[in-house]
Amino acid sequence: MSIPTPYEDLLRDVMANGTHKSDRTGTGTRSVFGRQLRFDLAESFPLITTKRVHFKSVAVELLWFLRGDSNVKWMQDQGVSIWDEWADADGELGPVYGVQWRSWPTPDGGHIDQISELMTNLAANPDSRRHIVSAWNVSELKDMALPPCHAFFQFYVADGKLSCQLYQRSADTFLGVPFNIASYALLTRMVAQQLGLEPGEFVWTGGDVHVYDNHVDQVAEQLSREPYEYPQLKILRKPDSIFDYTLDDFEVVDYRHHPTIKAPIAV
């Protein structure tokens, strides 16, 4: 029985069908528009195996988002530097993901904690079609070091299972997408546990789905590799709140992967 390879198939799609486009960074891309991947979180945890994905960085970044933080110092203290290229001299990034998730400003000077409201509403009214969190705050985009690439996500409850769909407006398919898939799969598992639900699907939807011109050789190397089965994720503790998880609460089991493939980041 062959191993499903939705992510690798997406890479092949971009390489075969992508249109060459210029971009903000000046690097150049091959790009397609409007793609979707699905992952069954009840079966496994979608950590890509054709190269190593650094799970610690995935988890630390997600916990940082949930803190509502805008400064890279907390991540640096955990040994994670993935946002350093965009931070200013003081480590500030402006009102990026976590700020919007936890402290979306209102016209009267208040703030909305979208994650707290999400958890409350999922518990009280699981069949609602409004279980949505947005990081795309048009009025604050100019103040962000980097406008949100993964901009908008929605949860869905059916038959005791929690599913999540992410809309990613800009998808760096080689470097970013494996990370984003793992991050939102992890978030879905965490939210499901807090609500006493089983994990359902994670659905990834991409807008401008691209491979940078300086990643083409790396993609070719990755696609030459045979995939392994996805690992399992164990969550070792159920804290009192979605905001109380720590890195030690997560254990990835049976993660068999090919070596890391390094590539430059387009800043």
UniProtKB/Swiss-Prot annotation:
SUPFAM superfamilies: Thymidylate synthase/dCMP hydroxymethylase (SSF55831). Pathway: Pyrimidine metabolism; dTTP biosynthesis. The lineage of its organism: Bacteria, Bacillati, Actinomycetota, Actinomycetes, Micrococcales. Gene3D superfamilies: Thymidylate synthase/dCMP hydroxymethylase domain. The gene is thyA. GO terms for molecular function: thymidylate synthase activity. It is an enzyme of class 2 (transferase). This is Thymidylate synthase. Catalyzes the reductive methylation of 2'-deoxyuridine-5'-monophosphate (dUMP) to 2'-deoxythymidine-5'-monophosphate (dTMP) while utilizing 5,10-methylenetetrahydrofolate (mTHF) as the methyl donor and reductant in the reaction, yielding dihydrofolate (DHF) as a by-product. This enzymatic reaction provides an intracellular de novo source of dTMP, an essential precursor for DNA biosynthesis. It comes from Paenarthrobacter aurescens (strain TC1). The keyword Iron does not apply. Pfam families: Thymidylat_synt (PF00303). PANTHER family: THYMIDYLATE SYNTHASE 1 (PTHR11548:SF1).
